[in-house]
């Protein structure tokens, strides 16, 4: 079984913000799998499905970004999911918009959701799908304001293709392994 975690913040005011692209990616993946039923457990919205006969649990922590590990750690323990079967999808300001990077065992890069998960798991040895949201064009815009801001109209126009590519990357990680997936999808 695999655990696919999309990071974001709960609540309508955050729904279409850059910081919630992890939630958006999980929603897109679940939609492609027929929208499996969602349960509220482990301080998260979770759903079970299969990706090409591989059982997966989708998770959207409802704890706010900085406490995401409070959902991930107990969920992994309950289902006995090993760290090598954890994929965390999150926003990445150091990647240009619509680019992505698959990495394993890397630092948190200042991302508070990753800090929370790594801190509670006691390890960074899990796969991350870093979805590029870019940096603010105006250097006077603070990063927190930028990531909590909504995507531009131009970015929204590219979103279906970007999320489809993210879904393909998750499938490739599961079916082909991180090395092949990284070679194919890292931009």
Swiss-Prot record:
Q: Which UniProt keywords apply?
A: Cytoplasm, Hydrolase, RNA-binding, tRNA-binding
- Annotated site, Stabilizes the basic form of H active site to accept a proton, chain positions: 91
UniProt keyword RNA-binding present: yes
Q: Where is this site: Discriminates between blocked and unblocked aminoacyl-tRNA?
A: 9
What are the catalytic residues? Answer: 19 (proton acceptor)
Keyword Cytoplasm: yes or no? yes
Write out the GO cellular component annotations.
cytoplasm
Q: What's the short name of a Pfam family annotated to this entry?
A: Pept_tRNA_hydro
Q: Which residues are noted in the entry as tRNA-binding?
A: 14, 64, 66, 112
Q: Which reaction does it catalyse?
A: an N-acyl-L-alpha-aminoacyl-tRNA + H2O = an N-acyl-L-amino acid + a tRNA + H(+)
| EC numbers, comma separated | 3.1.1.29
The UniProt entry's GO biological process terms, in alphabetical order, are: protein quality control for misfolded or incompletely synthesized proteins; rescue of stalled ribosome
GO MF term set:
peptidyl-tRNA hydrolase activity; tRNA binding
**Sequence similarity:** Belongs to the PTH family.
Please give the function described in this protein's UniProt entry.
Hydrolyzes ribosome-free peptidyl-tRNAs (with 1 or more amino acids incorporated), which drop off the ribosome during protein synthesis, or as a result of ribosome stalling. Catalyzes the release of premature peptidyl moieties from peptidyl-tRNA molecules trapped in stalled 50S ribosomal subunits, and thus maintains levels of free tRNAs and 50S ribosomes.
Assembly and binders: Monomer.
Q: Quote the protein name from its UniProt record.
A: Peptidyl-tRNA hydrolase
Organismal lineage? Bacteria, Pseudomonadati, Bdellovibrionota, Bdellovibrionia, Bdellovibrionales
């Amino acid at each position: 079984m695999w655990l696919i975690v999309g990071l974001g913040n709960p609540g309508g005011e955050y729904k279409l913000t850059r910081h919630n692209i992890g939630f958006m990616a999980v929603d897109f993946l679940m939609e492609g799998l027929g929208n499996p039923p969602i349960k509220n457990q482990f301080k998260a919205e979770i759903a079970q499905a299969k990706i090409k006969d591989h059982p997966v649990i989708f998770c959207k922590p409802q704890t706010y970004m900085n406490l995401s590990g409070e959902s991930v750690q107990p969920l992994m323990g309950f289902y006995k999911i090993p760290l090598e079967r954890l994929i965390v999808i999150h926003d990445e300001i150091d990647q240009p918009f619509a680019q992505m990077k698959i990495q394993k065992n890397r630092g948190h890069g200042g991302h508070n959701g990753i800090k929370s998960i790594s801190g509670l798991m006691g390890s960074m040895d899990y796969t991350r799908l870093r979805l590029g949201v870019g940096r603010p064009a105006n250097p006077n815009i603070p990063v927190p304001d930028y990531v909590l801001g909504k995507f531009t109209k131009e970015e929204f126009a590219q979103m279906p293709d970007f999320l489809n590519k993210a879904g393909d990357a998750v499938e490739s990680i599961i079916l082909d392994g991180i090395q092949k997936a990284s070679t194919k999808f890292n931009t």
